[in-house]
Amino acid sequence: MGLSSAAAGEGPQLCVFDLRRGQQEGQELDKILFFHPTDCPILLQLSVIGLCEGIITFARIFSPDDDCEVIESEKHSHVFYQAEADIWMVLVVEKNKDIESTWRCGALQGILKEVHSLFTMFHGPIRTLLDRQPSAELARGHLRTFFTDYLSDFNAGKKIQLPTFRDCLKERGTVQMLTISREVALEVQSLTTVLGSCLGNVMCQSLVLFEDLLVSTTLPPDDTLNLYTYAILRLTPRALLSNATSWSYLRKGTSVHAGPTSSSSNGTASVERPLQREKLYKGKDGFVAAGSTTSEVRGAVAWVPILWFQQAEDRMHLCVYQHKNITILLLIPASSLINGDDGIAHVKRHLLENASQNIVTLELKLSRGWGGENAYHVGGYRYLLVDPDRKVSRASPPGKVTTLSKDSLLSLNRLREEIDLEKSRAKRSDSCHDKDFEVCIRAKNNAWVIAKVTRGRELYMALEKAGETLLYASTAIEKFSNRYCEGAFSTD
């Protein structure tokens, strides 16, 4: 496996390739759709992908019905994800003796799943792009700019910093919900009804966020997750503030080049690079706008991208409105928007005229009842709750997780790795039934690290300065489950 890692010392390698392409001798380069780093020598790219293809083929001999997920060698980990039929994504990361670089392969695979889901939401399936233009230049162009902009979030100086053991109490690929009272729920329902009628008889869909938490959605779970993920990355007030910081930094002389950005024929901002951080900001009217490359002369232009959803039958225009800590993501069926920009303007007017008071009232009530960044802190516990079926999670605030010792975090990260393996084995042996697990490990510094999986729901926690008996750990789980999980993890 040495060939795959000749240049890995420069950082992780991420590649996307199509096994249906480049099958003839001399055409191997045709199967490469994306490779990071982009300046990696072609021969090295071919050797990495050739090795990955060999591993996939070899694994299928022994397990034809299950995809290869991870291959560990002495110096590297290869994390695989078959994003679409015969279209593979592989992340190659170098192992080293630096404990700070310790990762969990399940978390790395989560990155591959996330970027593919986001890409598909904006550009459609990769296979569709390849069928539309068999030369693959269209697909390669979109993949290059989109993946480059996505990976920029992991930049640490000149290198990419992937999630490490310090992120073991986070779960990528889930939504974090805001808990609301019955009174507030009625306000949310009223607002959702108004948003749904923004286009008259045609029903619009919507997501409502408060800060970085989901308040309501009218979309199915998979589509909700993808749009929520994008909102957290680029659209919430916190994300837009980060966008502005990035833009200021770039204006001072540092630039990132990943390909051209164009404008569409109707004057709206191009969505060729929806993850380009410095382009988006909140306009004076409250709607998110895009600054053009000549914004000093022309000003901002409308930003209404078209999205592809997995479970919706129609493509949707996305319109984003903000009021203080509230973010409204309004989705308008593309087939129902006959007049283009005029139709979008009509929807915006309807929102401002009919929903403004609802939004102001809801924001006030949510702000009054909001406990701040530590709202979901539970004294004595550092925890992560995951419901994979609903794609929902809740976790201790990041600031509280940082108080855990390195040993506790490393122990919990290793435990999560073991649970990932057990879940994978259980799924292969019986995909129709969830297997329950409970593991309590005594770690250093009088700590317990705990994992419990019950009826598909998962609980991970670390308890420091804790009693040394197993009864102490079991009692702590029971108390937490009964008070915060409606008894979902209780033994009774």
UniProtKB/Swiss-Prot annotation:
Transmembrane intervals: none
Origin: domain of life: Eukaryota
Record-level GO BP terms: vesicle-mediated transport
Pfam families: Intu_longin_1
Compartment(s) where it occurs, according to its Swiss-Prot or TrEMBL record: Endosome; Prevacuolar compartment
Keywords: Endosome, Guanine-nucleotide releasing factor
A GO CC annotation given for this chain: intracellular membrane-bounded organelle
Molecular function GO terms recorded: guanyl-nucleotide exchange factor activity
Comp. bias regions, Polar residues: 260-269
Positions of the UniProt region annotated as Disordered: 255-275
Family (UniProt): Belongs to the CCZ1 family.
Purpose: Plays an important role in membrane trafficking through the secretory apparatus. In complex with MON1, acts as a guanine exchange factor (GEF) for Rab7 protein family. Promotes the exchange of GDP to GTP, converting it from an inactive GDP-bound form into an active GTP-bound form. The active form is involved in protein trafficking from prevacuolar compartments (PVCs) to vacuoles. May serve as a linker between Rab5 and Rab7 protein families in PVCs and mediate PVC maturation.
Subunit structure: Interacts with MON1.
Name of this chain's protein: Vacuolar fusion protein CCZ1 homolog
Gene designation per UniProt: CCZ1
